[in-house]
Amino acid sequence: MTSTTSGALRRDLGLRDAVVVGLGAMLGAGVFGAVGPAAAAVGPSAPGLLAALALAALVATCNATSTARLAGLHPLAGGAYAYGRRELGDWWGFAAGWAFVVGKTASCAAIALVAGAAVWPEHPGVPAAVAVALFTALTCAGVQRTARVTAVLVVVVLLVLAVSLSAAAGGGLDPTALTSAAAGATPLGVLQGAGLLFFAFAGYARIATLGEEVRDPERTIGRAVAIALVTVLVVYAAVVVVVLGVLGTTTTAASALPLRDAVAAGPAPQLAVLVTVGAAVAALGSLLTVMTGVGRTALAMARDHELPAPLAAISPRSGAPAVAQLVVGAVVVAGVLTTDLRGAIAASSTGVLVYYAVANLAAWARAGRDPRRRAWERPVAAVGLLGCLVLVVALPPAAVAAGLAVLAAGLAGRAVLQGLSARRRAPGRG
């Protein structure tokens, strides 16, 4: 193993490691903080919020199925960036890769700010920057160490959730709160709620970016995605039902941490501090895995000369793309020190959905050319693609405009660089 742009990543991870990485990415700050904003978007309707959760899960399942199928066919680092290049062409691949890098880098900043707010609410950027610096060092140390740390964080979060849900439900749930005010939701509100809850599921893409680092990827990635997604869906459904059953829709919509408030309203309010701790730990766990995924995508793009070549260097000691991880860490630190949570989320939302849209389009195109395809492959990819586009349209216009502007800047930059390169290669020049 050498530190060169042609180096290969090590296949160190098994099924359990891949599942843990996916859970670490999905059981992040969203499980504690996404329910409130989603409830506010949906309106005073518990059935509407449950419908939004179901819609988010449907889109996530279609996306996960498409990405898992492609990851087995193309066991490379980079996720939909690699799939887009192979199945649709270089421009599609670049669009997916750039969308992932931009969206998930902004997500890293948002996640770090959530953790920072739990530690130092008045100045969240300071502890957020410290956490990013520490986790940058961990990602440079190698994916096995990253998976071990993530496993510890996942166990802690699951224990906190189990205790918190039991404590919140200990005083009983109001069944009428889960069935009343069905007419309070609007279609747009449900779609916006689904868009917010979707990002809580979105970490399964992290498993796909491990295509070059898992053993037997064609079998392992699909199983890992399925296990992680089902686990997270059960957890989110439990959180939504308990929170609505204790607080009702109005209080849930106004809460920054609904599960914490539900515990505080139960028979053991002293356990509410566990939710605050759990939110910080969950944010740190997802931060670690998402940062690693961004670095792997940057590595893949640098190998293909879509990003600067030094980003493809692999450390001979750890087997990690250390340069890419250092650059990602530096950008995220700058982000947490210069922007707020709302700005970070606005920059990430559109990018993530564009990434998954390309993945579904690639899966749809692949299935159309493959005589051995299963009958469900194209319909699943079509539903996933349509779901991504609908959720983008349902997002607040300002968020869509900001995300598309950054994506357009990247595409324009690529076009300019390609034009300059073509001119240099033209006869009579140089």
How should these model regions be labeled?
Residues 1-36, 40-47, 60-61, 65, ...:
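Membrane-interface "cap" regions at the ends of multi-pass membrane proteins
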Residues 4-9, 50, 151-277:
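Helix-loop-helix junctions that connect adjacent transmembrane segments
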Residues 9, 42-50, 64-94, 251-263, ...:
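Flexible loop linkers connecting adjacent transmembrane helices
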Residues 60-132, 136-140, 280-300, 325, ...:
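Hydrophobic transmembrane alpha-helices that form the core helical bundles
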Residues 82-84, 89, 121, 226-291, ...:
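TM-loop-TM module centered on a large, flexible mid-protein loop between adjacent transmembrane helices
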Residues 118, 136-140, 162-165, 240-242, ...:
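Alpha-helical transmembrane segments of multipass membrane proteins
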Residues 149, 311-322, 356-400, 416, ...:
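C-terminal membrane-solvent junction of multi-pass transporters and transport-like membrane proteins
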